[in-house]
Amino acid sequence: MNDLVADINNVLTKCGVAEKISLSDITITKKTVSDLVKPNAKLSDAITNFLWPSITSATVYHYTSREAAESILNSGIFRLNNIANRYTDGEILTFCETHDLKGYLEKDVNGDPKYRYLIMPNTFYASFTDVSLTEEQEEYFWRNFAACDGVRLKIEITAANPNFRKMRYEQTTGKPICLLSNLTRCIRAKYSREFILKGISRLCSFYLSGKDYGIENEYRALYRVWEGFGPQPKTDGALSYIELPLNSMSECGYQLTISEVHAKEQPKMPSSYIFSKRGA
């Protein structure tokens, strides 16, 4: 199977990935190639870090309604929301369809795709954007996420959790990421096996249609919930969420500090926050 390793390294090199693997870094079965049971998932980590590098700190904006902003500012709590709230927006689906992840797309007896109950229920996230925005982007965010009397929070994020990453956007509908596509195609065609990327169920959440969402240039903080381990979700009616206390490193691995508040009129908030009036 040294030829298989050589082919994998050849694909990595051609796609710009510097790392190389050896035979001991992967597990080869009759049907699959993976590093799922390896203590150091060298191949999967190399691919993930190349396509979706982790971000340890960033200054970002979060656009939201006045009501939500006042809740955050006065309670000192920021929420990660359940990704199932965006079931109809192409979350996870876009990645699975484009990259032919049939297992997640299979439907149950109720007609629901498997990803809806295998991935969505325990995936929580928050969306942010870059502070260097064009005039067009600024208008888009105010209009779509903070219309009328909405608020923009400038936030300093420090992440111990590796799942603070930038989104990848599909520039051509149905065209997969070349690195993943080339690797999968090579292993399937030459060795009649399927390549399994460790963490794929998590990475599905960092991919959306560029045509629909590319303007957002989104940073995403993600947290996966596991029963009996770490923070557990709370509910507010039909919605579930994870609470992040501001100004300290949370159990989820994120520290959020609000440095400025921008709006047309100052929201109700503690005097310790810096307010900047937004222009018309």
List the predicted regions and their residue ranges.
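Partner-binding and oligomerization surfaces adjacent to conserved cores of proteins
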Residues: 1-280
